[in-house]
Amino acid sequence: AHGIEVCVEMAQQGGVGLVIYNRKEGRALGEVTKFLVYNARKRQYGGDRAETYFERTECVAGVQDMRFQELMPDVFHWLGVTRIDRWASMSNMKHGALTAAGIAVVERVAIPDELIPADARVEMDAKTAAGYFTPMAPPSAAELALAKGRELHA
């Protein structure tokens, strides 16, 4: 929803807001694997923690991520986009794919902290520690080690 809000703001300011959705649910491993990973994260020793976020996916699926971001900029090229003034994605992989394809990104826009649910903190902390864009400092190793996710029977 935040990305759509950014698009609306750009259009209201006389620019263009563009939403491009690439279906890659659960790091392109699919919905079933995504839910198996969620279940494994809650059941692991020590609970759901950011420090083991990517490891759980690898234990369940054999890989951490199956997305191939290098193809993602093709849609922008087809539409004639050469510059993005406000990029509403925190993904370092998507940003890297865009810039490697010659598309300039002027400003990166993070999801505002107040829009991140408490039970999504594990995912966001793991991703920012792994290189996702954040205007703040990424979490420390000590912060990543804390159990922060929902309990199995909560």
What are these language model-derived features?
Residues 1-154:
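Catalytic domains of riboflavin
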